[in-house]
């Protein structure tokens, strides 16, 4: 069976053709601008197989975002520490993703729950071109521990199927992107289930797509491996998208190559 490998293909392109650039962390990168990946979610769940992705962390982080939370305490309760490097001494991260998704502040002093608004539109106006969620709140970026990398996403309905396109301004191709692809693919499944729709495509669009100089050996190892078939996702039925728990999300037939460790650029 022919296995589609859009992520690995882009990883190889950045490795071979990326332009040398410095970055905020001082690490150095190989970078390409304006790239896109497409996944048909109806034929498999896009969890990278050329290295093991820690799917537990993917699920708990998404549930944490959907809670509107921005303190790592809840993640710690579930054994997830992926945000620790950026958290304050009290565990706070400022008004990052979940806060913007669930309680975007307005000039009148109110708050907008963008996830609920998007769901309402999917149910009542599925042809709307305004089914958008943004984490890029310019006025609150100075208070965020880290400005949003995956900043903006849009939903699209056609022929009873829900698709999602994400714009990721800054894309750490080795460590971050496999995680982000899985997270937004899962979110698309959840939003579809809550809207009475089937899943369509997940489209990932990257701005600065980069490989850090200290990830090159790891990338070369990953690209030497033979990709395997994508797993399947099973999602329990819940009355609300905010009711999902970790046990509701099950991935089967995930047979990845071993994990590859690499340093995080902070």
Curated annotation (Swiss-Prot):
GO molecular function: thymidylate synthase activity
GO biological process: dTMP biosynthetic process; dTTP biosynthetic process; methylation
Main location: cytoplasm
UniProt keyword annotation of Transferase present: yes
Pathway the protein acts in: Pyrimidine metabolism; dTTP biosynthesis
Localization terms from the record: Cytoplasm
Listed HAMAP family: Thymidy_synth_bact (MF_00008)
Subunit structure: Homodimer.
Protein role: Catalyzes the reductive methylation of 2'-deoxyuridine-5'-monophosphate (dUMP) to 2'-deoxythymidine-5'-monophosphate (dTMP) while utilizing 5,10-methylenetetrahydrofolate (mTHF) as the methyl donor and reductant in the reaction, yielding dihydrofolate (DHF) as a by-product. This enzymatic reaction provides an intracellular de novo source of dTMP, an essential precursor for DNA biosynthesis.
Family: Belongs to the thymidylate synthase family. Bacterial-type ThyA subfamily.
Stated name of the protein: Thymidylate synthase
